[in-house]
Amino acid sequence: MTDNFFHGARVKENTDLQTAINDVDSTVIGLVAVADDADATTFPLDTPVLITRVISVLGKAGKTGSLYKSLKAISDQVSTRVIVVRVAAAGTEDGAKTQSQLIIGGSQADGSYTGMFALLTAEQKVGYRPRILGVPMYDTQEVTAQLRVIAKQLRAFSYSYCDGCETIAEAKTYREQFAEREGMLIWPNFIAYNSVSGENEEFPAVAYALGLRAKIDNEQGWHKSLSNVAVSNVLGITKDVFWALQAEDSDANELNANEVTTLIKRDGFRFWGNRTTDKDEYIFEVYTRTAQILADTIAEAQFTTVDSPLTPANVKDVVSGINAKLQGLVTAGRLIGAACWFDIVDNPKTSIPQGKAVVRYNYSPVPPLEDLTMIQTFTDQYYEAAFASLGGA
């Protein structure tokens, strides 16, 4: 008699399911801000801090610099996770670092990161990767340029102001300094009530863009652009911007034609503009964000697949799982179309024994309906039918 004799019935469970591909969280904001009077325990310098309920820390954000105004603008739009990196205000003594130097930061001798570079460590330190980046009120040209490098490394998208620009012409000229797909330029700023000072003050439009972007992702999806969505709790715009829906020669249209997003008032205040500073393929904000979020969604889902046996069955499961996810996004209206496949040309017999496999997928993102033309025709074709009933009367 064998040792494993059994007289009866038993069930051994296994699964035959594709690995589920979950969406990455696209709503996490990465904010770099200045506030010397902020609570140092809540907001330590040069350290990514996860805030899960922004409104609860407004009282600790101080009154100076940009931290309070930025968090207030974000919280007026959405309740979302915000990763805050607070940097010191620049000193006035000789040899002191400039504010832009402190905000940009870098890698220190001990290997630690300061300034916006601290955002690179956020995922390891607080468990979330920032996807929506901004440095409201301090986004000078050099800060914006470096922020876009950080955005590329994080597969994130950045929003920046046309720093120092007082006119439309200056904003158009400023825009020419940038060419990346990872950023949108905004001009001018909003006016809002500051409950701390009791005055109506200029508030950074970039901070509102960060909050509104997260709100749109939550309510509609990352395939919907920032443009033409009402912004909460603003009272005005800091510069005169002529806009009319049908006006081809408006200020807003001129700014948009030069890839600068502007602000308008119609049924409340809104951002108006869809464009990045890339003039080639990733011309729309949603094109860049779709590419980023799709890439991370597909790649991160393969964590448990890496180092599994490289068999035809496992590769087939990878392809099937990706196709299922892509078709789900198509059905949800977040992609126009998409497909994944295994091509033997990409996988020669010399590669498989080395533990290497390649699968391909493509997709068509959803463009914004930016230019709608309706053809109106004056015709006489309806007269006869309209008056035919009067015949013989």
UniProtKB/Swiss-Prot annotation:
Q: Which GO terms describe its cellular component?
A: virus tail, sheath
Spell out the disulfide connections: none
Q: Name one GO biological process term.
A: symbiont genome ejection through host cell envelope, contractile tail mechanism
User: What keywords were assigned to this record?
Assistant: Viral contractile tail ejection system, Viral genome ejection through host cell envelope, Viral penetration into host cytoplasm, Viral tail protein, Viral tail sheath protein, Virion, Virus entry into host cell
> InterPro entries of this UniProt entry?
Gp18_domIII_N (IPR054564), Phage_sheath_subtilisin (IPR035089), Phage_Tail_Sheath_Structural (IPR052042), Tail_sheath_C (IPR020287)
- Extract the Pfam families matched here: Gp18_domIII_N (PF22671), Phage_sheath_1 (PF04984), Phage_sheath_1C (PF17482)
Compartment annotation:
Virion
Role of this protein: Forms the virus contractile tail sheath.
| Xref: PANTHER family | PHAGE TAIL SHEATH PROTEIN (PTHR35861:SF1), PTHR35861
* Family named by the database record: Belongs to the myoviridae tail sheath protein family.
The protein here is known as: Major tail sheath protein
Name the species this protein comes from: Serratia phage KSP20 (Serratia marcescens bacteriophage KSP20)
Give the source lineage, highest ranks first: Viruses, Duplodnaviria, Heunggongvirae, Uroviricota, Caudoviricetes
